[in-house]
Amino acid sequence: MKKKLPFTIIHKNNNIDLFFNLHPETKDKEIVGKVAEELINNIDKQLKEYSTISDGDLIQSLAIVIATRIHISPFDNTKMINLMNQLIKNGLVDINNGKISKIGMA
């Protein structure tokens, strides 16, 4: 049975209900969800503080963090990069399959 992580985001007056398909070797989906939520909330906080940051600069910042994390992990860097690319692709598919509901005045 595939592990799925229910997740909700609010973006531009839309409530988006998602179900992320997790990697088969995911050890604890609750922790994955909590860490993802904390990271998203922290990014939102940073975006408010640095309101002039571009999407490109934000993505570059995230790439630096991910590259650093991959480098210090005990796994083969190339395999980790391939896994990361696949997880991103799968995550985008899951987001595109999310259920969108308008919030407030539509």
Predicted regions mapped to residue ranges:
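Solvent-exposed interaction surfaces and binding hotspots enriched for charged
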Residues: M1-A106
